[in-house]
Structures are given as C-alpha cells and as structure tokens.
A protein has these predicted regions:
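Membrane-proximal basic amphipathic "stem/tether" segments
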Residues: 133-145
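Hydrophobic, Leu/Ile/Phe/Ala-enriched alpha-helical segments that form helix-helix packing faces
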Residues: 14-22, 72, 85-91, 132
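Catalytic core and acceptor-binding pocket of nucleotide-sugar-dependent glycosyltransferases
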Residues: 53-127
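Short catalytic/ligand-binding loop motif for oxyanion handling, primarily in non-cytosolic enzymes
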Residues: 2-5, 34-38, 106-115
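An N-terminal, helix-rich hydrophobic module
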Residues: 27, 119-121, 140
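Conserved donor-nucleotide/metal-binding helix-loop-beta segment in metal-dependent transferases, i.e.
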Residues: 2-35
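Short, flexible, basic/aromatic active-site loop/helix in glycosyltransferases
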Residues: 39-53
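Structural alpha-beta junctions
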Residues: 20-25, 90-98, 138-139
C-alpha cells in the first residue's frame, strides 16, 4: 500500500542508472538495507552483501530481466524465492545488487513510500488498516468508522 506520492522522476533516473551500469538488482526499498556504500555513488546507494538475509527479496526493485529470470523457478512461491537456497543460486550472478539507503530509522526509504507488510498470515496489520481508514478505502471484515 503506497502512502505517499511516488517520485517518478527519481524512479526513471534509477532505471536508467541500473541499465547503463549493468546492475542485477536495484532495490528501491531498503528492507533490509545495505551496510556498505556502493563505490560509484556511495551517498545514493549501498551494496547488498550476498551473505545477508534477504539478499534476494521481493521488495520494490528494478531488476535486470535475465537476472530475475535466472532466479525464478517454476512452481516456486514467494517464500521459496526469498529463501537461502535461492540466495545461494544468486552467488553465481556477477552483476551487483545495490539498494537505496534508508532515509530514516524505519523503512522504507527511496522513491516509493509504501507499507512493506499489509497482511500477515491472512490478518491485516494495524498500520495498513489505519491507512485504509484514513483514505476511506473499505476492506472486507473491517469497519471504516
């Protein structure tokens, strides 16, 4: 659930940067975020470490098509995609994975501000309910009083 206006111009700049610099994945939501600066643009991006949890993530990102297709496995669900097994497959990828830095203590940073997890195990998170109520968006099973 997006809660602020998307900075489209910045997204377009990041797409161009990723394309021109042969980036495997440019994460637009630093969740988890990088720990080390990206050598080419250290104030804008950090490099993701292949050994970190959720190195492979389905958070908002700009993917190199071949990189993403290599990581997709038929009949695999989203939890498998983010698993350690798939992260090990990513060790074969030579293209770097980078991420925007967090702009504040809590994610997300970057050009798209959104609620990272709106539903957990079939239950709406309170932060998501609050946003839907604020925006007057009805959802099944929840009253918007």
């Amino acid at each position: 659930l997006i809660y602020k206006k998307v900075n489209t111009k910045l997204v377009e700049q990041y797409v161009e940067y990723a394309h021109n610099n042969d980036i495997g994945c440019l994460r637009l939501c630093p969740c988890p975020g990088p720990k080390l600066p990206w050598k080419h643009m250290p104030k804008t991006f950090g490099v993701l470490n292949k050994n970190d949890d959720y190195y492979i993530s389905l958070q908002t990102a700009i993917w190199d098509k071949e990189t993403l297709l290599y990581l997709l496995v038929p009949k695999q669900n989203i939890w498998h995609f983010e698993s350690d097994i798939n992260a090990k497959r990513a060790h074969n990828i030579k293209k770097p994975f980078i991420s925007v830095w967090r702009e504040e203590d809590l994610p997300p940073g970057g050009p798209i501000k959104y609620i990272i997890t709106a539903i957990t195990r079939g239950v709406w998170e309170q932060v998501a309910i609050d946003l839907l109520v604020k925006e007057n968006i009805p959802i099944n099973g929840i009253k918007n009083d």
